Regions:
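Residues forming the flavin
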Residues: 1-7, 12, 31, 82-85, ...
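Charge-patterned, long linear interaction tracts outside catalytic cores
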Residues: 2-21, 282-292
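Active-site lining segments that contact anionic ligands and/or coordinate catalytic metals
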Residues: 4, 21-23, 37-39, 50, ...
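A short, structure-level motif marking secondary-structure boundaries and short turns
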Residues: 7, 29, 100-102
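Aromatic-flanked redox-active Cys/Sec active sites in thiol-based oxidoreductases
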Residues: 11, 44, 104
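Short conserved micro-motifs on helix faces and helix-strand junctions that flank
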Residues: 15, 102-103
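Iron-sulfur cluster-binding cysteine motifs and their immediate structural context
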Residues: 15-41, 46-72
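Active-site cofactor/cluster-binding pocket
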Residues: 63-101, 107-301
């Protein structure tokens, strides 16, 4: 059962020493930039509740028993805006459509590949999915290779090879610039859609003052694929603000990429695939629509 106990860090008391990271080696302890310098916070969406971060006996920790995390409302964006989203661009497809989804374990990267594969199936297209989880666990790099095929009888390997990606869907910026992802980019073919919110890496646990600026990583993607081929959005920040949970960021990214013409799938088939997945259906459909809205009318958010 889920323990009815949560830990929080008081920003007013935290001195930013990073001992909580040292004690726990947990990536759910995240940096919080404030006018008084870098503090620490706990990503409640990712916390696995082993409570090791409190072992440093830091006075900034607050333990809450029996309470839940207050979620932001899902009605902050007017419904008429979501209903007025124009039809997405539809890519011209004359070959198998290759997608590489890059992210971190525990955030639903593999699920995204499965949902998009199901959406293709609902349109009577072929779909092949190949997940690369390797030895990664939660917060390790995960890649899902997806090929959408007009004629299922011509289906071949799902692996997205050198320069074969039509879409690099970067749910995590660090995972997106890894060699295994960059090798799939062809400047004349690949559209890159990436979450620009930088997630702290394991190095942050031992180097609490490390530079967490993602601009150089984003520039690296632009250098490989061309500035005009890269679209970035602060998906994690927007998802947290509008849905109350960072886990909505990846579904948000699907909507964002679809609206920009990165996926040869219909809105209806993707939403139906989310329904068939059967997990937090309304939450994920809402996040998907927010992603579409961010691509078509960013000022609305």
């Amino acid at each position: 059962p889920d323990p009815q106990k949560r830990l929080f860090i008081s920003q007013e008391v935290c001195e930013g020493c990073g001992d909580c990271s040292t004690q726990s080696n947990c990536l759910s302890v995240v940096p919080k930039e404030t006018p008084l310098g870098r503090k620490r916070g706990i990503d409640q969406s990712a916390c696995n509740k082993d409570y090791s971060c409190v072992e440093g006996f830091c006075p900034s920790f607050v333990t809450v028993h029996g309470g839940g995390v207050k979620r932001a409302g899902m009605t902050e964006v007017p419904m008429e805006l979501l209903q007025a989203i124009p039809a997405p661009k539809f890519p011209s497809v004359d070959h198998d459509w290759s997608v590489l989804i890059a992210g971190v374990g525990g955030t639903g990267v593999v699920t995204i590949g499965a949902v998009l594969g199901m959406a293709a199936h609902l349109e009577n297209k072929g779909a092949a999915v190949f997940d690369m989880t390797g030895v990664s666990q939660k917060n390790g790099a995960v890649y899902s290779h997806l090929k959408i095929i007009e004629d299922p009888d011509t289906m071949s390997s799902a692996d997205v090879g050198l320069g074969e990606a039509d879409l690099l869907l970067g749910c995590d910026l660090v995972a997106s610039v890894a060699p295994v992802a960059v090798r799939t980019i062809d400047p004349n073919r690949t559209r890159v859609v990436v979450n620009e919110t930088l997630t702290a890496t394991p190095q942050f646990q031992s180097s609490p003052n490390m530079n967490l600026e993602g601009g150089l990583l984003l520039k690296g993607l632009q250098d490989h694929s061309g500035v005009n081929q890269v679209s970035s959005v602060a998906a994690t920040r927007i998802a947290l603000s509008l849905t109350g949970d960072t886990i909505g960021a990846n579904t948000f990214m699907i909507g964002y990429a679809l609206q920009l013409g990165g996926l040869p799938l219909s809105v209806e088939s993707v939403e139906r695939a989310i329904e068939l997945n059967g997990v937090a259906v309304q939450f994920n459909i809402h996040a998907f629509r927010l992603g579409r809205l961010a691509a078509s009318n960013p000022d609305a958010l």
